[in-house]
């Protein structure tokens, strides 16, 4: 599970930051999932090492322009390139109307299947490896956060030990790898769990934007390996945050702390905190770390490899930039 930030600015792009989009690359499935698709997202993908041909799912949090204005352009380009098999899009009520209207008035025809799923709180997608759930956030319009949970899997199978026990290879190995108990032809009963290493705990990612501090975000982020949370405002601008129903750095950090996450990655920063201003982005990072030390500030094209629990969890962010 590798996260790439394609846009980390709120509202409008800046010279250094595009508007909201986050890519989740799943190498084991050769799939690419997007979370939000602000204007210019396809340009950001082209500037990265991501493969648009692997795009299979897009999750939209809400229908504000800085989160959806890049959607139609990306979908249309995928059709012209002819290298996308199918795209499933998940989002709030009204998303399908937006796509249908835009395609009708622009005479855009897609050469591949697109399925729009109107989401409600709960499980919205599941396969043999992942479960995706969504929950309501607290914003000016209906907004959803998303949680991607990788399923636990059996530990590494000890083939050498199986050979020592003279267990015949083949279908039985598959059963033992899954931790099943198998009776051999000679009558021996083999417990697969005894031939496997420790269970590999599935990784969890939560994506919460746009929102003010709310229980819904805490619930989605519970015990996550990484929480991506908006931090539009500095703490001293909390009055504006309450008026516009956006989060401050301290709200993002409090969410991470309450949810017991392992890493907080802040995004969706107001352009008002540009270098040279009274408050700069580095100040926002210090505010959050005062509450939740394991915080980093995302920047465009930053990648983060979500570590497995058996690996070190504090050394997976590429070099920082604010």
From Swiss-Prot:
- What cofactor does this chain's UniProt record say it requires? Zn(2+)
Reactions it catalyzes:
Endonucleolytic cleavage of RNA, removing extra 3' nucleotides from tRNA precursor, generating 3' termini of tRNAs. A 3'-hydroxy group is left at the tRNA terminus and a 5'-phosphoryl group is left at the trailer molecule
What does the record give as the active site?
Answer: 66 (proton acceptor)
Q: Which residues bind Zn(2+) 2?
A: 66-67, 210, 268
Q: List the disulfide bonds.
A: none
Transferase listed as a keyword: no
Specify which residues bind Zn(2+) 1 according to the UniProt entry for this protein: 62, 64, 139, 210
The molecular function terms of the Gene Ontology recorded here are: 3'-tRNA processing endoribonuclease activity; zinc ion binding
The EC number(s) attached to this protein equal: 3.1.26.11
| Keyword flag Amino-acid biosynthesis | no
Q: Name one Pfam family in it.
A: Lactamase_B_2
- Which note does the record give on the cofactor? Binds 2 Zn(2+) ions.
Which top EC class applies here? hydrolase
Q: Which UniProt keywords apply?
A: Endonuclease, Hydrolase, Metal-binding, Nuclease, tRNA processing, Zinc
The task this protein performs is described as: Zinc phosphodiesterase, which displays some tRNA 3'-processing endonuclease activity. Probably involved in tRNA maturation, by removing a 3'-trailer from precursor tRNA.
Subunit structure, per the record?
Answer: Homodimer.
Family indicated by similarity? Belongs to the RNase Z family.
- The name of this protein is Ribonuclease Z
Please report the organism this UniProt entry assigns to the protein: Nostoc sp. (strain PCC 7120 / SAG 25.82 / UTEX 2576)
Please name the gene that encodes this protein. rnz
């Amino acid at each position: 599970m590798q996260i790439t930030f394609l846009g980390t600015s709120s509202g409008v792009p800046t010279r250094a930051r595009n508007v909201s989009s986050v890519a989740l690359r799943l190498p084991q499935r050769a799939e690419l999932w997007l979370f939000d698709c602000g204007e210019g997202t396809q340009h950001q993908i082209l500037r990265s090492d991501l493969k648009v041909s692997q795009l299979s799912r897009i999750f939209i949090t809400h229908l504000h322009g800085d989160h959806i204005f890049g959607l139609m352009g990306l979908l249309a380009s995928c059709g012209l390139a002819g290298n996308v098999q199918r795209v499933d899009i998940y989002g709030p009520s009204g998303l399908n109307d937006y796509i249908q209207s835009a395609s009708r008035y622009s005479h855009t025809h897609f050469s591949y299947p697109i399925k729009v799923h109107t989401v409600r709180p709960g499980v919205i997608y599941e396969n043999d490896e992942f479960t995706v759930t969504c929950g309501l956030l607290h914003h000016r319009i209906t907004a959803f956060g998303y949680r991607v949970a990788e399923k636990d899997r059996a530990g590494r199978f000890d083939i050498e030990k199986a050979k020592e026990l003279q267990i015949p290879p083949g279908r039985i190995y598959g059963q033992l790898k899954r931790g099943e108990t198998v009776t051999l032809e000679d009558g021996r009963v083999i417990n697969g769990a005894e031939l496997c290493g420790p269970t590999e705990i599935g990784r969890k990612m939560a994506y919460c934007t746009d929102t003010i501090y709310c229980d819904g975000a805490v619930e989605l982020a519970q015990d996550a390996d990484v929480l991506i949370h908006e931090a539009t405002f500095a703490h001293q601008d909390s009055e504006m945050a309450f008026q516009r129903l956006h989060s401050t750095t301290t709200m993002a950090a409090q969410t991470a702390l309450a949810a017991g996450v392992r890493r907080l990655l802040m995004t969706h920063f107001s352009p008002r905190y540009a270098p040279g201003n009274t408050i700069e982005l580095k100040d926002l990072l210090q505010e959050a770390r005062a509450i939740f030390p394991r915080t980093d500030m995302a920047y465009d094209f930053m990648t983060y490899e979500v570590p497995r629990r058996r690996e070190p969890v504090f050394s997976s962010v590429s070099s920082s930039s604010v």
